[in-house]
Swiss-Prot record:
Similarity annotation: Belongs to the peroxidase family. Classical plant (class III) peroxidase subfamily.
A GO biological process held by the record: rhythmic process
Lineage, broadest ranks: Eukaryota, Viridiplantae, Streptophyta, Embryophyta, Tracheophyta
Name of the gene this protein is made from: PER42
Induction of expression: Expressed under a diurnal rhythm (circadian clock control).
Amino-acid positions noted as binding heme b in the UniProt annotation, renumbered to this chain: H197
Cystine connections: C40-C119, C73-C78, C125-C323, C204-C231
Catalytic-site annotation from UniProt: H71 (proton acceptor)
Annotated residues for binding of Ca(2+) 1: D72, V75, D79, S81
Protein name stated in the entry: Peroxidase 42
């Protein structure tokens, strides 16, 4: 090769290196641990303190934080679309039937306001939703879960997609497994996530079909009188606060008692019953019933996968000024 040829190759190599360097420089950051360490170093501490204060005042907030992460992150993207209010043109996700019983959204706003006082326009509502779930899990005795941050907020609700992603409590375990698989959560992860039914409550409107007109014979007969006492109406008023605690033994503690209950046919929802008796999930249920450390390990892994489901990062989406409104509607 002549001198000119060597020179041309050298120039092309330098150009390629320069282009690669620019591409790396311009690549948008994704999720990472401690994303706010430079822009809002106190962010995670503020969320932690706010959740502790709110939990001290209202114990049931912990259950709300836990439900929020599932209902938001399972529906296509972990982008806080769940928090958006309905508009004249669009029904908000939180108003959909699949979101029945979700509440305490105003407390997300309290956390947002505390963060805005410290670092205006920096911390996204989607990160608040995820971090508050982590703190809520720990507040009810669950494991501390390391979670990445750096999400940005979506611009619109995804109400039209809810039924495609969120399983209904009456659907078969095969459908539930498939929906979780679509977001990267395997069978042990699904079984662990449903262990969140260890805390909180089930509204009567979601379980009366197992009591009326005839009691579901698969229910433990020792548990039925309590369910009938708590849900005395075959058509309960959806606005009435009628419910059964998911776990009468340790209702405020996230533990593996749920698995022992469903093996004893005390699960309130059909999905609980199927989980305990389907050949694909029963061995995992039995293992988690005996080994809380295994339950916590799989639960941690599943929450991490869920929290990283298709997030908006870099320049995508926005940082909302108010969590219930996209900035264009502010």
């Amino acid at each position: 090769m002549g001198g000119k040829g060597v020179m041309m190759v050298a120039i092309l190599c330098l150009w390629a290196l320069s282009a690669t360097s620019e591409a790396v420089t311009e690549a948008e950051p994704g999720l990472m641990m401690n994303f706010y360490k430079d822009t809002c170093p106190q962010a995670e501490d503020i969320v932690r303190e706010q959740v502790k204060l709110l939990y001290k005042r209202h114990k049931n907030t912990a259950f709300s934080w836990l439900r929020n992460i599932f209902h938001d992150c399972a529906v296509e993207s972990c982008d806080a679309s769940l928090l958006l209010d309905s508009t004249r043109r669009e029904l908000g996700e939180k108003e959909h039937d699949r979101s029945f019983g979700l509440r305490n959204f105003r407390y997300i706003e309290e956390i947002k306001e505390a963060l805005e006082r410290e670092c205006p326009g920096v911390v996204s509502c989607s990160d608040i939703l995820v971090l508050s779930a982590r703190e809520g899990i720990e507040a009810v005795g669950g494991p501390y879960i390391p979670l990445k941050t750096g999400r940005r907020d979506g611009l619109k609700s995804r109400t039209d997609m809810l039924e495609s992603y969120l399983p209904d409590h009456n659907e078969s375990i095969s459908v539930v497994l498939e929906k979780f698989k679509s977001i990267g959560i395997d069978t042990p992860g699904l079984v662990a996530l449903l262990g969140s039914h260890s805390v909180g409550r089930t509204h009567c409107v979601k379980l009366v079909h197992r009591l009326y007109p005839e009691v579901d014979p698969s229910l433990n007969p020792d548990h039925v009188p309590h369910m009938l006492h708590k849900c005395p109406d075959s058509i309960p008023d959806p606005k009435a606060v009628q419910y059964v605690r998911n776990d009468r033994g340790t209702p405020m503690v996230l533990d593996n008692n749920y698995y022992r209950n469903i093996l004893d046919n005390k699960g309130l929802l059909l999905v609980d019953h199927q989980l305990a008796h389907d050949k694909r999930t029963r061995p995992i249920v039995k293992k988690m019933a005996k080994d809380q450390a295994y339950f916590f390990k799989e639960f941690t892994r599943a929450i991490q996968i869920l929290s990283e489901n298709n997030p908006l990062t870099g320049s995508k989406g926005e940082i909302r000024k108010q969590c219930n409104l996209a900035n264009k509607n502010h």
